[in-house]
């Protein structure tokens, strides 16, 4: 692993645990063994480093979802919705730092004043909602999902799923303990009757 990759990996953990505001470059330097000058050689400032991480988070999450949905054969759109929910919960459980980073409030405060930060966050969430929307559209085409606004329904499905992940991220409730109920509730909401 290159020094730059090592810095990115450690900084991802640090920003996930402490947030953008409270993470310090001195602490990152200590964690990686890289001098602060080396960190600033690779990344102009703390904000640039954070934006690099957000871009990596976006690409990682969306690419993993794209790979997953490309290799899966879904019987129906309703089955795809259930699988996407399950995979989202799986990803959040296996990559907790990525999701904790997205759930930290200070990223959104930065997005208010930094258009690149806002773009990365919007692209990440739009990419995820688009996956849910594809599943809803597929279900409406095959008849497994009733007639409703695909985009609005995708937003609701994503919000339900991500809300459960947030509980898990903040150690309030184990997302896995409710995954079956979440999927069953979404099925009841969507099924074409």
Protein language model regions, located:
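Generic hydrophobic, amphipathic alpha-helix propensity
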Residues: 3-12, 28, 53-57, 61-64, ...
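Helix-turn-helix
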Residues: 6, 14-48, 52
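Amphipathic, non-transmembrane alpha-helical scaffold segments
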Residues: 8, 50, 54, 58, ...
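Amphipathic alpha-helical interface segments
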Residues: 10, 14, 87, 91, ...
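Short coil/turn segments at alpha/beta junctions that flank glycine-rich nucleotide-binding fingerprints
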Residues: 17-21, 95, 142-143
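Hydrophobic alpha-helical connector segments
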Residues: 52, 67-95, 153-157, 179
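Helix-loop "lid/cap" segments that line or gate small-molecule binding pockets
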Residues: 86-93, 103-111, 185-190
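Hydrophobic/aromatic-rich alpha-helical bundle segments in the mid-to-C-terminal region
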Residues: 97-104, 118, 122, 129, ...
């Amino acid at each position: 692993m290159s020094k730059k990759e090592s810095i990115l990996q450690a900084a991802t953990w640090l920003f996930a645990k402490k947030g953008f505001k409270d993470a310090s470059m001195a602490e990152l330097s200590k964690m990686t063994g890289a001098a602060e000058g080396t960190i600033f050689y690779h990344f102009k400032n703390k904000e640039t480093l954070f934006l690099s991480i957000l871009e990596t988070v976006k690409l990682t999450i969306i690419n993993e979802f794209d790979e997953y949905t490309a290799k899966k054969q879904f019987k129906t759109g309703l089955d795809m919705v259930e699988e996407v929910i399950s995979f989202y919960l799986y990803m959040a459980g296996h990559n907790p730092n990525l999701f904790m980073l997205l759930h930290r409030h200070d990223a959104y405060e930065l997005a208010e004043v930094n258009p690149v930060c806002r773009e990365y966050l919007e692209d990440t969430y739009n990419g995820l909602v688009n996956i849910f929307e594809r599943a809803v559209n597929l279900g409406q085409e095959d008849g497994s999902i009733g007639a409703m606004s695909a985009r609005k329904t995708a937003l609701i499905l994503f919000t339900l799923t991500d809300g459960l992940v947030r509980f898990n991220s903040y150690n309030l409730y184990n997302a896995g303990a409710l995954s079956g109920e979440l999927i069953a509730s979404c099925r009841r909401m969507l099924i074409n009757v």
